[in-house]
Amino acid sequence: MKKLLIVIGLLFIVVWGYAQKPNYERMANTVMDKVVVESKFTTKKGLKWTYDLGVPLEGVFEVWRTTANETYFSFVKKWMDKYIDKEGNILNYSAEEYNIDHVKNGKVLLALFKATNDKRYLNACHRLFAQMQSHPRTNEGGFWHKKIYPNQMWLDGLYMAQPFLSEYADLMQKPELYDDIVNQFVWMEKNAKDAKTGLLYHGWDESRKERWSNSKTGLSPHFWGRGMGWFVFALVDVLDYFPSSHPGHNKIVAILQRTIKAVAKYQDPKTGVWYDVVDLADREGNYLEASASSMFTYAMAKGVRQGFLDKKYLKSIKKAHAGLVNEFVEEVSPTHINLNKVVAVSGLGGTKNYRDGSFEYYMSEPVVANDPKGVGPFMLADIEFERLKNQSAMSKSTHVILDNNSNTESKDSKKLLDNFQERISSARVSANAY
């Protein structure tokens, strides 16, 4: 009987291991079943146009590109089609709000246009671009975070708009946009960077009128993890479509290098991940946070893979990826996982329950499982880690041997990626014909 139980146990382990999908795919399944559901995006006015939708959908779209499983593509398209009508109008979107968060979903729309050549998605992107053409700015030219937050630049805002604008400029052949894209990062770093740590403060108020802002510097009090995460996320994604021949390209790379150097110093040596308030690991109440840790892992892995960051970070990346799994991932089944310890939201100011940017404020926000702002970056970080690992293996040997948990790119997936690149080329032609 004892031997039989041992055999059954071993068979269970083998079957579980054989059936288990890569973590990015298991996370995508959780997103489709539990995260991106209508009940979470429906308000009294109907479906809400929010970056909380675009962040996980971008992750699911990349899972489609990696696996060639049409289920993931269909899910992304189905959700965007709830918002985009036949003319490319966006449901419950108001450009006049001048909310930079609302531009983020344009990345998903651009991806769908390239995949389908359906001009509805491109027309919707034109509307988002039009918002940014008249979006309020600081005196030197930085985009306000929102009209209701005048004179303020937040780290979050760089992620919400600049990757979209970079890809839009590439698609629509608008090289005149690149200088402005570079300057947004230059100004953010100049105004928000701490000389001692190299980290960037969450927000900067040019007017110095906000209660959270320092009367001399205009800066918020702390280095928020996900804010820093949004910033490095934006840097590596902007570079996807930013021409290397442009003089601003090296400026973006240099900002990425400086910022990652600073972030790497605060990686928790025990777990490999990062704290919610990055530099205060020993402060009572501070906690290891999943979304920021996923974003840092993603930016480091992608930066090294694309040659923008030194390979000296490989050890940190490996430790960070292991930390994501060990510290935050909860096993559900061979096809699903949960992502724990994601801060639901953190901001600055406002009219109700004013957010003063204090340490106590950041610690007061709820920490949840499977928040959209965590699961999206986690999928992308997991994919980037596998791509980097495969690239490293290829550079060492023409005969690639990966461990059982690695995703080896299938012929179907390779064909899909090649076809997608062809679609991008044809999309440029189509885009400029509309």
Q: Where are the model-predicted features located?
A:
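Carbohydrate-binding/catalytic loop surfaces
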Residues: 58-61, 99-112, 143-157, 198-223, ...
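Asp-box/WD-like beta-propeller blade repeats and closely related beta-sheet repeat scaffolds
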Residues: 121-160
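Alpha-helical scaffold segments in carbohydrate-active enzymes
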Residues: 30, 34, 59-62, 82, ...
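Oxyanion-binding "anion nests"
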Residues: 232-281, 285
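Inter-helical turn/loop segments and adjacent helix faces that build the functional surface
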Residues: 67, 168-179, 238-250, 303-311
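CBM-like carbohydrate-recognition segments
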Residues: 22-54, 66-73, 82-100, 106-108, ...
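Bacterial Sec-dependent N-terminal signal peptides
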Residues: 1-22, 425-434
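Loop-centered beta-sheet repeat module
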Residues: 178-239
